[in-house]
Regions:
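Feature responds to low-complexity, polar/acidic, surface-exposed segments characteristic
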Residues: 16-18, 34-99, 106-127, 134-158, ...
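Surface-exposed interfaces of beta-sheet-rich extracellular modules
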Residues: 1-21
């Protein structure tokens, strides 16, 4: 069976349930069942490097590449329910990530543009990525706002919710810079936060020669450990809220 995360009846959440009984039926009712979409317990490798041996942490990342990352991270239940090659985008048919884009769109995670395009090869922006991350969880209000994200900004709710959860951060000048292209390192940092994945720094230090690592990544880089967390599949346990790696997969 599926792991059900929510049952929505007539637009109202009923919480996780194995079954739901309609009572006093006098008109048509709507029923929506949501399944867990992300692999939160299985720490697979979801980021890959390049043939030159680098991971290019400061490079931009395309909308297709982000689609591929989250496709790898889909739970088995979500794959079973949402996998498809059907889409309505005008520019995805020949994309290498057509299945990934179609599936995540079917799951309600990805959205295209008003002109009918998806723009798979375009660099994804900070606002767009925050919106994608936010769709994996319920939106929450909060006091974390940014000077360049007004309340009428299309991604205001997603950005402020993600900031409240600690998934995204702004800059020291109080801005979020929503239209800036997000970097690969920033994507990994946010994705790990969404998945509640934290790197075992001691394990990395003691076993570096066994790990997938990169020639453009030094231990002084701010996302060094996050990138190792995302690049190396591993078994782990949690001790005192800290992730302890047991072995590599």
């Amino acid at each position: 069976g599926y792991t059900i995360t929510d049952v929505i009846v007539d637009g109202k959440s009923q919480g996780p349930k194995d079954s739901y009984e309609f009572k006093n039926i006098r008109e048509n009712h709507t029923l929506e069942v949501k399944v867990a979409k992300l692999l939160t317990g299985d720490h697979i490798a979801y980021i890959k490097g390049y043939p030159d041996g680098g991971v290019h942490p400061t490079a931009n990342i395309t909308r297709a590449e982000v689609s591929a990352i989250f496709y790898r991270l889909l739970s088995d239940d979500a794959r079973s329910v949402y996998t498809t090659n059907i889409h309505n985008f005008t520019d995805v048919h020949n994309s290498w990530a057509s299945t990934e884009i179609s599936t995540l769109t079917n799951a309600g995670i990805l959205k295209g543009y008003t002109d009918g395009s998806f723009r798979p090869d375009a660099a994804i922006t900070r606002a767009e990525f925050a919106a994608i991350a936010a769709r994996f969880d319920k939106l929450s209000g909060g006091n974390k706002t940014f000077s360049d994200v007004p309340t009428d900004h299309w991604a205001y709710a997603a950005i402020t919710s993600a900031a409240e959860k600690g998934w995204v951060n702004g800059y020291s000048d109080g801005t979020f810079r929503p239209d800036n292209a997000i970097t690969r390192a920033e994507v990994v940092k946010i994705t790990n936060a969404v998945l509640m994945r934290t790197c075992d720094k001691d394990y990395v230090a003691d076993n570096l020669s066994k790990l997938i690592s990169y020639n453009d990544l030094t231990s002084a880089y701010w996302a060094y450990y996050d990138i190792h967390e995302a690049s190396n599949a591993h078994d782990y346990k949690v001790v005192n809220d800290a992730e302890i790696w047991i072995n590599l997969k």
